[in-house]
From Swiss-Prot:
Catalytic activity reported: UDP-N-acetyl-alpha-D-muramoyl-L-alanine + D-glutamate + ATP = UDP-N-acetyl-alpha-D-muramoyl-L-alanyl-D-glutamate + ADP + phosphate + H(+)
Binding site for ATP: G115, T116, D117, G118, K119, T120, T121
Domain of life, source organism: Bacteria
Location in or out of the cell: Cytoplasm
Pfam annotation, one family: Mur_ligase_M
Known pathway: Cell wall biogenesis; peptidoglycan biosynthesis
UniProt keyword terms in alphabetical order: ATP-binding, Cell cycle, Cell division, Cell shape, Cell wall biogenesis/degradation, Cytoplasm, Ligase, Nucleotide-binding, Peptidoglycan synthesis
Protein name listed in UniProt: UDP-N-acetylmuramoylalanine--D-glutamate ligase
An annotated GO BP: cell wall organization
Any one GO molecular function term: ATP binding
């Protein structure tokens, strides 16, 4: 839809979180007539913003008024299966996401990043690369989306010269229909959010694939060729309508087929584009205590591939990659206390993210895990846990499930709070060992979000010292 088509139209916004309030503001500035409806309570901050914008709203349920609309914008935390959204569909009212809405207004080049793991790190690193290039060439880079800043709040300040780096969750992509990123990145697909997708990895992957549904000539799709689900999806005989760039950790596995790729050979990042190969920099120039492990090498390759597709100079990438120290709450060293190394990996909200953390931390660790379960299957990491973990401290709503899953694999103790978990970890850890806080679950049972969870963990570690 074109922005001018919204003028004078009633648009219902479902959900009063950051993205919902920002979407309402964008609609109001476009001359539409937004109405926001929140099933729960609207926060005082959101209510004040809506009043300032002149946007009417309701809370404590959805009235008939929400259906008196030409368009519905749904917040990412609201499934398509809830009654209000099902009724929207039944009445023929188009339902789109805040990402879709904001994209109608976006003059900037869009780089979209999705996947089960690595989205935030890749988006953060890529944004820093693009921002550094922008300082040289006179454009701005914006970091928006699932990273915490609504796309719709920033899009009014963008120009055609700028780059918008979007971290995109499956929830945000579900209701995207005309969204067309110039460059799309798929980091990996492993089971996650199975509670939302009825236990179907296929349904979850389908939501992720919406990132390239509207891509065409002139666009680029970058994917992890080492991921079996993505490889099966993209390796087909008929050509895709967009440029395809593969990435992987072994150049020899990619060099057997034509096409562009980014990989590693003899300890160096290598890039093949338009038939020629270039060596960018050594891997050991990138890896450091806050940015280590195979998964972060994939994140670096994804960022390099996307930056090259956006026309960023290799020297800009080298400078940013050499100085990048990682992202908060992602295998972040929280401190050394009581003779132990405490690692904050609060962003690990899936089993695969936990697997990556376990592979990066020395054996003999104590693992603190648990939270609100998302349909997790822990059997796939049982052997790795047996090899690497001396004791698990299970917390949150899923603590009993975790205890049952690892019974006979490694000792498990349960904690009623994060503070108790930290104390139990201290008691059960051997001198010099690591304590890894990698929940593999969402945070909403005990915390506001994963950031709140990670900061509370770091505060508890500071108190130990």
């Amino acid at each position: 839809m074109k922005p001018e088509e919204l003028k004078g139209k009633v648009a219902s916004v479902i959900g009063a979180g950051k993205s919902g309030v920002s979407a309402a503001g964008l609609l109001a500035r476009a001359g539409a007539r937004p109405f926001l409806s929140e099933f729960g309570a609207v926060s005082p901050e959101a209510a004040a913003t809506l009043r300032q914008l002149g946007v009417p709203f309701e809370e404590g349920g959805h009235s008939e008024r929400v259906f008196e609309a030409a368009l519905c914008i749904v917040s990412p935390g609201i499934p398509q299966t809830v009654p209000v959204i099902r009724e929207m569909h039944a009445r023929g009212i188009p339902v789109v996401s805040e990402i879709e809405l904001a994209s109608w207004f976006c003059p900037a080049r869009i780089i979209g990043i999705t996947g089960t793991d690595g989205k935030t790190t890749t988006a953060t690193l890529l944004h820093r690369i693009c921002a550094a290039e922008g300082e040289r060439k006179g454009f701005r880079a914006f970091s928006v989306g699932n990273i915490g800043i609504p796309f719709s709040s920033e899009v009014p300040g963008m120009t055609a010269a700028d780059i918008a780096v979007l971290e995109l969750s499956s929830y945000q992509l579900e209701a995207c229909f005309d969204f067309r990123p110039n460059i799309a990145v798929l980091t990996n697909v492993t089971p996650d959010h199975m509670d939302r997708y009825g236990g179907s990895i296929e349904a979850y992957a389908t939501a992720k694939y919406r990132i390239h549904a509207r891509q065409g000539a002139g666009d680029t799709l970058i994917y992890n060729h080492d991921d079996p689900i993505l490889r099966a999806h993209f390796d087909r005989s008929e050509p895709w309508p967009f440029r395809l760039v593969r990435l992987g950790l072994r150049a020899e596995t990619l060099d057997v087929a034509p096409g562009d790729f980014v990989s590693v050979e003899d300890g160096e990042i290598v890039v093949r584009a338009s038939g020629s190969t270039e060596r960018l920099m050594r891997v050991d120039e990138i890896m450091k205590p806050g940015f280590r492990g195979e998964h972060n090498l994939y994140n670096a390759l994804s960022s390099v591939a996307a930056a090259l597709a956006a026309g960023v100079a290799p020297e800009t990438m080298r400078g940013v990659l050499a100085g990048f120290g990682g992202v908060e709450h992602r295998q972040e060293l929280a401190g050394n206390a009581c003779g132990l190394n405490w690692i904050n990996d609060s962003k690990a909200t899936s089993v695969n993210a936990l697997r990556q953390a376990l592979q990066s931390v020395p054996a003999g660790m104590v693992l603190i895990a648990g939270g609100r379960d998302k349909g997790n299957d822990y059997s796939a990491i049982a052997d790795l846990v047996r090899e690497k973990v001396a004791c698990i401290v299970a917390i949150g709503e899923s603590r009993r499930k975790i205890a049952d899953a690892f019974r006979g694999v490694t000792p498990v103790v349960e904690a009623a709070s994060l503070a108790e978990a930290v104390e139990l970890a201290r008691q059960n850890a051997r001198p010099g060992a690591s304590v890894l806080f990698s929940p593999a679950c969402s945070s909403f049972d005990m915390f506001r979000d994963f950031e709140d969870r990670g900061r509370q963990f770091k505060q508890l570690v500071r108190e130990l010292t």
